[in-house]
Every structure is written in structure tokens, then in C-alpha cells.
């Protein structure tokens, strides 16, 4: 996403600090808990995709690192975007609406794919570009010096996106740099440690080859993405008409088999969802399993849900969560 580079009205300044920057976590979040990394830089120069681990956690032509929130409810509560390294603000854009690209009301995206964004010069030809920021949330001005970890805006839904996330592009001159493996070219390594340009504290943005659980919980009826994005259904009680466990995961591969089992207080399986293997890779996948309430309501006790993703007969992702009624 390079659309901020083309804005002729913006003042261009340079920061003095030379050398390769070390990148701090650019979001005020805890990786693996309330933020996740669905997409890396696409290192494949031609058709096809390749991330730094030689996997496919990216998409065609993707030039940055995406760090997403769990849902729109988190975005509305407000999550700060942080400067990844010290530098000086050289370009910015504000005023783009926070609306999903899938919304018929979304404005034209050509040349404005980044949405609201901030570009910071870190010296030595290095810069970072933060995209999809919330309208009206940018706290910095062109020419302003910033420190690593300083809040510069909040996560939004502006530009070419359908879910709340930060898109962070790293460049040295005209070259896009993959912060997990900054060496240039299309090379990748299944054994790359992924530290790259990141500080030790940001290393929690670990590569998750088995995908990741984005949301998990219980509901009193069928669950869809809209309910999950709104923050999840309310906690069911003993008089709920049904008891449903749900999980939404990201970065699953074709052939993966998600399995979700709901067990009652007596250890008896109440429901189990196990479909056919996925026909293709899924950026996100929602599964739920549930049962209608018995006469007289749900017995008191601990209800347990077990989620697993099976790949070639091996469990690559799992989560257990409970509900006490």
C-alpha cells in the first residue's frame, strides 16, 4: 500500500537518525490474546504467494504486516497505534471514513487503499507507513518527532479493508522490507526465527503455522460473524433455549479439519461439529456446536468445549474453554 506516497500536498521532511531501526510492537495490544497477525509480506515476485517462512500467510502483492483486532467491538472501544521506532512524521492522511470495503457505501479506493495513514521517517532511508487508521484519531502532525511506542492514532476501518487491523509497511528507499526477514529478494526459510527488525518485546508476534483462535465462547443459539464482530453473544444462563459453543479461527489451510465438541457436567458429549476437510485455505473460519435445552433447563455444573484443528492426522491448533451454569 503506497497511496500516501503520491499525495502532492504533503510536506516531505527527513529524520536525522541513521542506521537500521529496531521495531517495537506497533499496537497497544497483547499478541495472541487481543491481536493477531493474519498476513505477512508477500515475498513471491510473480504469481503465487510466499511468506518469510515459505508458507502462504499472505496474499498476492501484499506489501506489509497486518495485525488485526479480535472484532469490531474492540475497534470501537479504541486501540492505539504506536510508532514502531523513533523518527519524524513526514506524511499523513485523515478524513477517510471507517467503513468496510464490502459495504455498498464504501468510497472509491483507487489511490487511497491505505485509508487514513501516517508515514514516519526513521533516518537512513528507512520509513514505516501505518494504514487503516480511525478517522479523526491521528494525534501527530507533519514534522513532529515521535518516540518508539508513542501513540499516533487508533485502529480503524478506513481504506481497502473489511476487518479492523493495522497494516504496517516498512521501506528502505523504494524497497519494501519484510520486517521478519529483512534480507531482500524472494528468499524464504522454514527455519527463520522471525526476529528480523523486531525488538525482543515485539517477538511475541510469533509465526503460527497452525493458525490461531481469534474468538471463542458460548451462546444461546446459532452464531454468525456479525454477532462475533459485535463482541460476541451474551453469556447464556440455565434457562437459555439452547447452549452453543463457537470458535472463529484464522489462517487455516486447505485439508484442515476443525472439530468442536461440547460436553456437559456429567461428561456426556452434548454436541459435536466435525465437517469435511476444508476445500481451500481460509483467512477465517467459524464453527459452532450446540444443543437445545432439555425440559426444565440446563443442569447446574461445568460445561466444556474442546476445539482442535487436525492437519494430516495431527493436532496443529487447540483450545479448551468452559462455562459454569
Q: Could you say what each language-model-derived stretch is?
A:
Residues 18-48, 108-110, 139-144, 169-246, ...:
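Acidic, glycine-rich catalytic/binding loops that coordinate metals and/or anionic ligands
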Residues 299-310:
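A short tyrosine-centered beta-strand micro-motif
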Residues 80-91, 139-154:
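Short, well-structured beta-strand-loop connectors
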Residues 279-293:
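Aromatic sugar-binding surface patches on proteins
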Residues 44-83, 92-110, 222-240:
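Short glycine/threonine/proline-enriched tight-turn/helix- or strand-capping micro-motif at secondary-structure
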Residues 314-325:
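Short beta-strand elements
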Residues 76-78, 84-135, 170, 258:
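Zn2+-dependent peptidoglycan hydrolase active-site motif and core
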Residues 270-281:
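Solvent-exposed serine/threonine-rich low-complexity stretches and specific carbohydrate-binding patches
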Amino acid at each position: 500500500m503506497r497511496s500516501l506516497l503520491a499525495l502532492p500536498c504533503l510536506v516531505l521532511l527527513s529524520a536525522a537518525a541513521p542506521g537500521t531501526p529496531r521495531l517495537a510492537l506497533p499496537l497497544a495490544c497483547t499478541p495472541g490474546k487481543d491481536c493477531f497477525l493474519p498476513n505477512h509480506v508477500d515475498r513471491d515476485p510473480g504469481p503465487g504467494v510466499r511468506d518469510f517462512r515459505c508458507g502462504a500467510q499472505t496474499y498476492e502483492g501484499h506489501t506489509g504486516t497486518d495485525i488485526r483486532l479480535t472484532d469490531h467491538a474492540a475497534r470501537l472501544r479504541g486501540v492505539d497505534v504506536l510508532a514502531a521506532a523513533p523518527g519524524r512524521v513526514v506524511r499523513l492522511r485523515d478524513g477517510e471514513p471507517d467503513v468496510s470495503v464490502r459495504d455498498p457505501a464504501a468510497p472509491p479506493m483507487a489511490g487511497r487503499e491505505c485509508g487514513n495513514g501516517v508515514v514516519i521517517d526513521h533516518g537512513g532511508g528507512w520509513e514505516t507507513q501505518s494504514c487503516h487508521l480511525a478517522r479523526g484519531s491521528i494525534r501527530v502532525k507533519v514534522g513532529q518527532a515521535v518516540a518508539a511506542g508513542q501513540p499516533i492514532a487508533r485502529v480503524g476501518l478506513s481504506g481497502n479493508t473489511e476487518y479492523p487491523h493495522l497494516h504496517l509497511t516498512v521501506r528502505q528507499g523504494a524497497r519494501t522490507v519484510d520486517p521478519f526477514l529483512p534480507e531482500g529478494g524472494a528468499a524464504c526459510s522454514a527455519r527463520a526465527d522471525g526476529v528480523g527488525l523486531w525488538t525482543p518485546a515485539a517477538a511475541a508476534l510469533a509465526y503460527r503455522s497452525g493458525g490461531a483462535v481469534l474468538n471463542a465462547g458460548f451462546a444461546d443459539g446459532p452464531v454468525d460473524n456479525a454477532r462475533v464482530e459485535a463482541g460476541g453473544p451474551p453469556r447464556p444462563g440455565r434457562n437459555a433455549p439452547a447452549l452453543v459453543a463457537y470458535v472463529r479461527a484464522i489462517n487455516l489451510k486447505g485439508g484442515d479439519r476443525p472439530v468442536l465438541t461440547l460436553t456437559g457436567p456429567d461428561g456426556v458429549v452434548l454436541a459435536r461439529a466435525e465437517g469435511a476437510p476444508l476445500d481451500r485455505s481460509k483467512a477465517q473460519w467459524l464453527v459452532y456446536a450446540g444443543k437445545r435445552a432439555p425440559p426444565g433447563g440446563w443442569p447446574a455444573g461445568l460445561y466444556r468445549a474442546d476445539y482442535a484443528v487436525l492437519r494430516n492426522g495431527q493436532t496443529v491448533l487447540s483450545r479448551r474453554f468452559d462455562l459454569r451454569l
